[in-house]
């Protein structure tokens, strides 16, 4: 079973990276988002990390897209689906948590539908 699953796609002309990582501490999420931003150049990065039964969610939006997309809105929506609350950050990077691992795919689908 892979511990790091990355899927890059284009949704409505915007590059989107969905990433799910097993055994990653939530504090390392920002690093993955930064790498994703560099590799995509421009786009939206959605990362879920699972460690010790807890879920971390981080969303990054590259600078040119922050006038249209807000990372905070994405993490609030995503964390509600996985049983978390709130979350916060800035329009270009936001983070939240959750507990329902089996809902991660639902959260990915919902977040992609917002793009």
Place the predicted regions along the sequence by residue.
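Glycine-rich, acidic loop segments that terminate in or are immediately followed by a histidine
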Residues: 14-115
């Amino acid at each position: 079973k892979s511990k790091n699953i990355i899927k890059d796609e284009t949704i409505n002309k915007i590059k989107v990276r969905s990433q799910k990582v097993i055994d990653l501490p939530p504090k390392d999420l920002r690093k993955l988002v930064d790498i994703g931003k560099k590799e995509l150049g421009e786009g939206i990065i959605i990362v879920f990390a699972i460690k010790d039964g807890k879920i971390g969610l981080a969303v990054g939006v590259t600078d040119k897209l922050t006038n249209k997309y807000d990372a905070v809105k994405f993490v609030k929506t995503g964390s509600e689906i996985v049983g978390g609350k709130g979350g916060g950050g800035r329009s270009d990077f936001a983070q939240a948590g959750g507990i329902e691992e089996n809902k991660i795919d639902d959260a990915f689908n919902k977040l992609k539908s917002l793009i």
